Amino acid sequence: TLLTLASSAEAQFFGQPSDLPIGEAYHVEILGGMWNPTPSLTISSEAFGIAGTDIDFTSDLGIAAKRFSEVRVRLRPGRKHRFRIDYVPIRYSAQSVVGRRLVFRGIAYDVGVSVNSTITWNTWRLGYEYDIVHRSHGYFGLIVEAKYTEVEASLDTQFGREFARARAPIPALGAVMRIYPVRVLGITAEITGFRLPEGVDQSYGGEYIDFDVYGTLNFTEKIGVQIGYRSLDMSGFFETESVDL
């Protein structure tokens, strides 16, 4: 569930307020809230010429679901133009006993070894949206954005700590559609993604897909609540690391 706060806008800029849905006349919109993703985290890391195991941080290391915060900012200089800024910090940690032999960063972790595992996944999204169709009861727009993703996984035992880190700027294209069945309720669906096929670059490859559908109930022009479903998937390889999140 997300709490939505939006600043007011001058009526002559967007048209008569009576023609617009509640909460649609704004210059700046700030959303802050929580979401509870189902963890699906697989990472492999090689070192010293030794291939790494595909480690499932859920089944192998006991990572469990938890809630995370999210911040979204929308800057709207014109009726059909939106600049988008999103930040999603994700961090999991767990303590477990290895149930099968794992190899990570060239180090073997045998059955029975106690491991403290941590994985962080931070994503920034900077984008621009242009609404090619904009009506009083909804709009349809195209999105171009750049995502900056940083993933770090670490295993800590009595013998030492090993970690793998992958950073990548990822361009993405997408689309968004919103409809207002009534003036106080907006229903939105958006998707962005990018795919770099294998063979284009021998060091990097993979895909990133972000799908979001949600409803926004606006109590006033400045306050509303939002609830919905989001799927955020990334898979790829970065030199000696591969990830599937």
Locations of the language-model features?
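Detector for outer-membrane/organellar transmembrane beta-barrel domains
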Residues: 139-141, 148-151, 159-197
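Transmembrane beta-barrel architecture of outer-membrane proteins
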Residues: 25-27, 66-70, 121-125, 168-172, ...
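Residues on the lipid-exposed face of transmembrane beta-strands in outer-membrane beta-barrel proteins
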Residues: 30-32, 71-75, 85, 126-130, ...
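Repeated loop/turn-to-beta-strand initiation elements of outer-membrane beta-barrel proteins
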Residues: 80-83, 136-138, 183-187, 219-225
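Extracellular/periplasm-exposed beta-strand and loop segments of Gram-negative cell-envelope proteins
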Residues: 38-66, 89-122, 148-168, 196-204, ...
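Transmembrane beta-barrel strands of outer-membrane/channel proteins
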Residues: 30-36, 85-89, 142-148, 189-193, ...
